[in-house]
From Swiss-Prot:
Protein name: Claudin-16
Record's disease association: Hypomagnesemia 3: A progressive renal disease characterized by primary renal magnesium wasting with hypomagnesemia, hypercalciuria and nephrocalcinosis. Recurrent urinary tract infections and kidney stones are often observed. In spite of hypercalciuria, patients do not show hypocalcemia.
Consequence of substituting residue 65 to S: No significant effect on protein subcellular localization or paracellular sodium-selective transport
Record annotation: effect of changing residue 162 to C: In HOMG3; localizes at tight junctions when coexpressed with CLDN19; displays almost normal interaction with CLDN19 yet it prevents functional synergistic effects on ion selectivity
Tissue expression notes: Kidney-specific, including the thick ascending limb of Henle (TAL).
Length: 235
């Protein structure tokens, strides 16, 4: 059961870290809505904006100004949150790899490997927090901006909605939460053994064999009184 839970958590951690990294460095956080009067598809990301012509499929991208330039608060905060989530998710996944039983790292220390899995789970839980905050906040801001324009009957010729990069960030964050929950909440399921499992199997087997041989070789000495009593009982 322990191995199965570890592999499930590793599966979610791998794809979650990948989703977060792809979401951070792709350009479709905002995409023009279907009701926009545009002949091209516009996508806005955290680092650049791309336009794809609907007729010939030509795609052109323009990078934003320098990082030190003034940017909207939504863009700056989302960048910081997603980069933090990427680093933590990657670190959590690599840490989890060291804690897997199939990895030849500290093979004689199962208790330490369980602790490594616990640290990886806690890191993944922490990684999901900035990821989900950044993704949801960006999506809500896009929705509120669009709803405000519609409410005040303001039409700028193009309306935006959040795109697949935003969805990918949410999925990666939820995956981090799930992997972290499996590793932390199920930690006691990993401890399905007693204290003797802190020693390698070969040593436990050697100790057991030595104990059996010592028990067989040892016989309590018989006193003279016991011998006399045995003779009397036979008579």
């Amino acid at each position: 059961m322990r191995d199965l839970l570890q592999y499930i958590a590793c599966f979610f951690a791998f794809f979650s870290a990948g989703f977060l990294i792809v979401a951070t460095w792709t350009d479709c956080w905002m995409v023009n809505a279907d009701d926009s009067l545009e002949v091209s598809t516009k996508c806005r990301g955290l680092w650049w904006e791309c336009v794809t012509n609907a007729f010939d499929g030509i795609r052109t991208c323009d990078e934003y100004d320098s990082i030190l330039a003034e940017h909207p608060l939504k863009l700056v905060v989302t960048r910081a949150l997603m980069i933090t989530a990427d680093i933590l998710a990657g670190f959590g996944f690599l840490t989890l790899l060291l804690g897997l039983d199939c990895v030849k790292f500290l093979p004689d220390e199962p208790y330490i490997k369980v602790r490594i899995c616990f640290v990886a789970g806690a890191t993944l839980l922490i990684a999901g927090t900035p990821g989900i905050i950044g993704s949801v906040w960006y999506a809500v801001d896009v929705y509120v901006e669009r709803s405000t324009l519609v409410l005040h009957n303001i039409f700028l010729g193009i309306q935006y909605k959040f795109g697949w990069s935003c969805w990918l960030g949410m999925a990666g964050s939820l995956g981090c939460f799930l992997a972290g929950a499996v590793l932390t909440c199920c930690l006691y399921l990993f401890k399905d053994v007693g204290p003797e499992r802190n020693y390698p199997y070969s040593l436990r087997k050697a100790y057991s064999a030595a104990g059996v041989s010592m028990a067989k070789s040892y016989s309590a000495p018989r006193t003279e009184t016991a011998k006399m009593y045995a003779v009397d009982t036979r008579v």
